[in-house]
Amino acid sequence: MAIERTFSIVKPDAVAKNFIGQIYNRFETAGLKIVASKMIHLSQEKAEGFYAEHSERPFFGALVEFMTSGPVMVQVLEGENAVLKNREIMGATNPAEALAGTIRADLADSIDENAAHGSDALESAAREIAYFFSDDEICARTR
């Protein structure tokens, strides 16, 4: 199997509840390595740019407002089938529909404040990683 990289955000709701460590533990327990990570407070411009594909959707304004409401953790995860594995760890977008044991089922309160974001494909992962990290901020995990 090929080693992939994917992008993840621990959203403001999960950061505010001190769930960063629990979420990182789930990544690592599933065999994903964290190869880049930083805490940032998204500006409106940065959030609007990241979610630009949703700009015409009715929830766009509320999404940007939520994502700028507090700090987030952005990270690059690496491992076999990283994109799919991370999406399985996160669970369904709506926590009410997420399987027990997933981040969203266990740690999220609503579809609007659902604790985590994860890339949905290799192409979006590459774009999202480049949006937040330069190549020299990503560290190879050779040990």
Swiss-Prot record:
One of its GO terms (molecular function) is ATP binding. It comes from the Bacteria. Its EC number is 2.7.4.6. Its main location: cytoplasm. It is found in: Cytoplasm. It catalyses: a 2'-deoxyribonucleoside 5'-diphosphate + ATP = a 2'-deoxyribonucleoside 5'-triphosphate + ADP; a ribonucleoside 5'-diphosphate + ATP = a ribonucleoside 5'-triphosphate + ADP. Its cofactor is Mg(2+). One of its GO terms (cellular component) is cytoplasm. Keywords: ATP-binding, Cytoplasm, Kinase, Magnesium, Metal-binding, Nucleotide metabolism, Nucleotide-binding, Phosphoprotein, Transferase. The active site is at H117. GO terms for biological process: CTP biosynthetic process; GTP biosynthetic process; UTP biosynthetic process. ATP binds at K11, F59, R87, T93, R104, N114. The keyword NADP does not apply. CDD domains: NDPk_I. NCBIfam families: PRK00668.1. Homotetramer. Belongs to the NDK family. This is Nucleoside diphosphate kinase. It comes from Colwellia psychrerythraea (strain 34H / ATCC BAA-681).
